[in-house]
């Protein structure tokens, strides 16, 4: 379990799960709006933002929380946060660019950053796995 209550809006922490980095990002309203405004059919790995977040204890989608495995889907490098032209993630190894929803936008990566299985155990705690 991880406490996410202290992560400020617009910030991110990295935790380890099964030896992998997990990015836990507290998205701003602007980041959410940007992710929702994308024409999903134009994406290499089409997936709406709502499919990349889950409902919290109250049953509402917790759109402010993006939780992804921090491993590029190209060759396994660790992307840099808040980088690239979409303010999401940038992989320094081969130039893949992900948006604020962790979706691949440019570069050689074939898939979006993976969303691990997780659940909210309270308003401020998540359990991964």
Model-derived regions: residue spans:
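Residue-level structural signal for beta-strand termini and adjacent loop
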Residues: 27-28, 110
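Structured loops at beta-to-helix junctions and adjacent beta-edge loops in soluble globular domains
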Residues: 18, 25-27, 70
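Short, surface-exposed beta-strand-loop junctions and turns on beta-sheet-rich folds
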Residues: 30-32
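Rieske [2Fe-2S] iron-sulfur-binding domain
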Residues: 34-129
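Short hydrophobic-aromatic micro-motifs
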Residues: 22-25, 128
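C-terminal segment of N-terminal export signals and the immediately downstream linker at the start
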Residues: 1-20
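Short, surface-exposed charged micro-motifs
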Residues: 14, 23, 117
């Amino acid at each position: 379990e991880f406490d996410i209550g202290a992560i400020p809006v617009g910030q991110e922490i990295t935790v380890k799960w099964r030896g992998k980095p997990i990015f836990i990002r507290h998205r701003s309203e602007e980041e959410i709006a940007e992710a929702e405004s994308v024409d999903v059919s134009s994406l290499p790995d089409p997936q709406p933002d709502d499919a990349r977040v889950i409902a919290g204890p109250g049953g509402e989608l917790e759109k402010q929380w993006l939780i992804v495995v921090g491993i590029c889907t190209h060759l396994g490098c660790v992307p840099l946060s808040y980088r690239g032209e979409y303010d999401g993630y940038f992989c320094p190894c081969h130039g893949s660019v992900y948006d604020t929803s962790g979706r691949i936008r440019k570069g050689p990566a074939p898939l979006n950053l993976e969303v691990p299985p997780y659940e909210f155990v309270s308003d401020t705690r998540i359990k991964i796995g």
